[in-house]
Amino acid sequence: MNITPIHDNVLVSLVESNKEEVSKKGIITSLASNDKSDANANKGIVIALGAGPAYGKTEKPKYAFGVGDIIYFKEYSGISFENEGNKYKIIGFEDVLAFEKPESGKQRKR
């Protein structure tokens, strides 16, 4: 896919799962959605990061997460689209609420 986010936007591949998950530190995340076609639309794997500042800002964002990390973001943020059967979303940096590193053994791309 040749989509590159601009400014402080983040391109994510949506994670599909309809179950509660428990992190290694015991945090329970319920990812079920009322609309099963868009389940877990608030969790995704980072595919690409925008390289510039948002409109009206002079500093580039300092991302604490990178390509390959899993992020959680506001439910109604950004735009959703499909490409070759996969679901993606482009969201603003300020809509990212939390992130986690991939499980050990899975390498993160930079």
Curated annotation (Swiss-Prot):
GO terms for biological process: chaperone cofactor-dependent protein refolding. It comes from the Bacteria. CDD domains: cpn10. It holds the Pfam family Cpn10. It is found in: Cytoplasm. Keywords: Chaperone, Cytoplasm. Belongs to the GroES chaperonin family. Heptamer of 7 subunits arranged in a ring. Interacts with the chaperonin GroEL. This is Co-chaperonin GroES. It comes from Mycoplasma genitalium (strain ATCC 33530 / DSM 19775 / NCTC 10195 / G37). The gene is groES.
